[in-house]
Regions:
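Conserved catalytic-core segment of nucleotide-activated headgroup transferases in glycan assembly
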Residues: 17, 21, 134-198
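Conserved acidic donor-binding segment of nucleotide-sugar-dependent glycosyltransferases
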Residues: 248-258, 265-271
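Active-site proximal beta-strand in glycosyltransferases
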Residues: 49-54, 64-84, 106
């Protein structure tokens, strides 16, 4: 199957398997051996499948144009399924109409599938797994993992305050990656990592013993996935596939901070529980998220 990707990015061609910044859509492109085009480009050949991310500033993007050179056209979810409801009403309607005109809707989680099926009554909504292109990582150093890292800062999008309260209940020092929406005074409570590309991030994450990511904004779930690949137990909220499938013993109901505190205490004080969660995360990553599993939802296209 020949696949093309259409986004607002300006380059044309394929992403190498060793790309240093292998974010979600790049990983999809690599796994599908897809050629990338800017959404304004006109390919000089016909593709079996075209996948596009609906532009935020132009949600009325004309999928009929893509159908001229793609036998089927799919839209890829980006961000939480409710994100478009912060658009103007006009653009919300345009976004909805673009969704319904696609042949396939690819989504991140089982809960997203339920949402989009109900919203659009679309007959072909598929969960397309998040994945990691492991070639890009290279060799990891043997390190003695220490401390705790959270998946985001102090904004509601990342649920950073929830994560901090849980992490700080067992660890005096809490580390977090620097995010785009930085809050004044964050450095007084947490150690912020500098901005880094995806490869650098994986190598840095490998130094930590426990992950906490109590993020209510469910999308691709890369933090829980990255932790699972490394065998780092990660505490997170229910509703995110990567969290539930890779860290089932560490998944709590949204808002159940008390249960999360109990889990981090047990991880920190019971080597038996920690080692079991670590082993389980690695094994379940291989079962659910290795690259070979990714293409299973393309059958029948």
């Amino acid at each position: 199957m020949e696949v093309a990707f259409f986004t607002e990015m300006g380059f044309h061609g394929k992403i190498p398997r060793t790309h240093n910044n292998m974010r979600t859509e790049f990983a999809w492109m690599v796994a599908l051996n897809a050629v990338h085009y800017n959404i304004k480009d006109v390919p000089n050949k016909i593709y079996d499948l075209g996948i596009t991310i609906i532009p935020k500033n132009n949600p009325q993007f004309d999928l009929e144009k893509l159908k001229k050179y793609c036998n089927k056209v799919a839209v890829m979810q980006e961000g939480p399924h409710w994100y478009f409801q912060d658009y103007t009403l006009e653009n919300q309607i345009k976004y909805y109409n673009t969704l319904t005109s696609a042949d396939i809707i690819f989504v991140h989680n089982k809960t997203d599938k339920i949402y989009y099926e109900g919203l659009t009554s679309h007959s072909d909504v598929r969960v397309m797994r998040s994945l990691m292109i492991e070639d890009a990582i290279g060799s990891l150093k043997e390190v003695e993992r220490q401390g705790v890292i959270t998946g985001g800062n102090f904004v509601s999008w990342y649920g950073g305050f929830d994560s901090y309260i849980v992490a700080n209940s067992q660890f005096e020092q809490v580390t977090a990656p620097t995010m785009g929406r930085k809050q004044e005074g964050e450095e007084q409570l947490i150690t912020l990592l500098p901005y880094m590309n995806w490869k650098e991030w994986i190598h840095k994450l490998n130094e930590f013993k426990i992950g906490v990511h109590l993020m209510r904004t469910h999308a691709a779930g890369t933090f829980a996935l990255n932790c699972a690949y490394l065998g780092i137990p990660c505490i997170g909220y229910k509703g995110l596939d990567t969290q539930e499938q890779c860290h089932p013993e560490l998944t709590v109901e949204v808002g159940n901070i008390g249960h999360a505190k109990e889990l981090i205490k047990e991880l920190n004080n019971s080597s038996e529980f920690y080692n079991e969660c670590s082993r389980q995360a690695k094994e379940r990553y291989k079962v659910h998220y290795e690259e070979s599993k990714f293409k299973s939802n393309l059958f029948g296209i």
